Amino acid sequence: MTIDLNVIQSDIISARRAPENSLFIDGKFVSPIEPAAKPIPLINPATEEIIGTCANASAKDVDSAVENAYNTFRSGIWAKWPGKQRGLVLRKIAKMMREKRELLAGIDTINCGKPTPYALFDIDSCADMFEYYAEVAETDNPTVKVPLPNNPGFCAFEKRFPRGVIGVITPWNFPLKMALWKLVPAIASGNCVVLKPSELAPWSCLEFALICKEAGLPDGVLNVIIGSGKESGAALSCHPKIAYLAFTGSLATGKKIMHAAAENIVPLTLELGGKSPLIICEDADLSLAIPSAAFAIFFNQGEACTAASRLIVHESVADEVLGGLVSEANKLIIGNGLDPQVTLGPVVSKTQFEKIVSYIQSAINEGCKCVVGGLPRSEQKGYFIPPTVFTNVQTHNKIWREEIFGPVLAVKTFHTNEEALELANDSEYGLGSGVFSTNPKTLEFFSNNIEAGMCSLNNYHVVTHELPWIGWKHSGLGVGLSKHGYNEYMRLKQITQYVG
């Protein structure tokens, strides 16, 4: 049976309920007050065709959204609700997300190109996350009595409060999932949010906003603005009524946001780039390590901040590992993410496509050896990059040092564990890492000494909302996900009382 992908795409677009070129403010879809420019065209990266447009909000729209969120927060609706009451709404949102999973996943696929099974997984994991944070909110005790044995005339408490208006700026690689990683703990803890998703893939966030309204989230708790980072993102970053900023994106943009936040002394979390190392030791179970290494770089077209783009493999097993990687790369089915057989979709945009191609060309020019993949076919429609592996890589090569954000793997060999550790830590980034070995002491050595916020042993890597998401070095600040992430969106007060 032939699948008509054009019909599938048309059905997804027709099923959307968010009006074209709209923002979501105070529980309503609205047009920009004063657009910064013409609407932004949205392109399906698998076909290079324009499938619609989105709003291009100005600073005035940002101000409207923030003022609305601020007034909503100050009113006490939501912020002063008991955690159990907020939890009921969060659980209703989870239920409705599951009911709309095919639509939400389909929107993300036509916006950013990811294969449908991965997009569906994203939506399912987000619904699970709502359930998790519903339980956190329901069971959280924000007031804790602190014993003062040296001050018997006093009683003391630590009390946590929601911060206020949270500004959230998120990327295009996981359009809805990255937004909800920040949004869910923020609203679960009683805050109001102004969300600016990427203008390359904004539709699922707008559709999600309507789900929240229908689930009973009070108007003004979630506001969504769409526009360029230069205009609306910058305005959100420096708005004086923002109490906290949460950003996921590039290191360069993260530095700008940190500078803007500093002007108002606004705390923030930053999840920035990565150049994550994966180490395969001589005693590793290669039947596990090889497919894991392939998945770690080729998943989501390599458009993941934790993509293991540096493979450090023991010289004694290097040939077998490389042969296995070539085999795994050749198994991938490249094509339109709407096709259920596809396992590697296009990268998100022409800009990203050209950037990745330039890295591949740079590696070739610098003498690296391409063992699979390489430059894409020039006549091919769509922003497709073949899964690519380079050996003969030097540590000064761009593909070893810089984040590519595509399905491009750089491989180096090592002789001793100390040498592997030095290679792993020779990076400005410190987000993800992984080690494959059957020796517990080897695993302990690497997990204790790799300079990264997350380390996966004999896997790569478990991403779950129960565990904290942490970037070291230039990979970020603060903590996402888990109860630690929930507490990031709350401020702490010390209360003491004289009791005689």
Swiss-Prot record:
Residues that coordinate or bind NAD(+): 249-254
GO molecular function: betaine-aldehyde dehydrogenase (NAD+) activity
Site (Transition state stabilizer): 173
Record-listed E.C. numbers: 1.2.1.8
A GO CC term attached to the entry: nucleus
Alphabetically ordered keywords of this record: Meiosis, NAD, Oxidoreductase
EC class (word): oxidoreductase
Active site: 271 (proton acceptor), 305 (nucleophile)
Pathway: Amine and polyamine biosynthesis; betaine biosynthesis via choline pathway; betaine from betaine aldehyde: step 1/1
Coiled-coil annotated residue ranges, if any: none
GO biological process, one term: meiotic cell cycle
Similarity comment: family membership: Belongs to the aldehyde dehydrogenase family.
InterPro entries from the UniProt entry: Ald_DH/histidinol_DH (IPR016161), Ald_DH_C (IPR016163), Ald_DH_CS_CYS (IPR016160), Ald_DH_CS_GLU (IPR029510), Ald_DH_N (IPR016162), Aldehyde_DH_dom (IPR015590)
Signal peptide: none
Protein source organism: Schizosaccharomyces pombe (strain 972 / ATCC 24843) (Fission yeast)
Protein name (record): Probable betaine aldehyde dehydrogenase
Top-rank taxon: Eukaryota
Catalytic reactions on record: betaine aldehyde + NAD(+) + H2O = glycine betaine + NADH + 2 H(+)
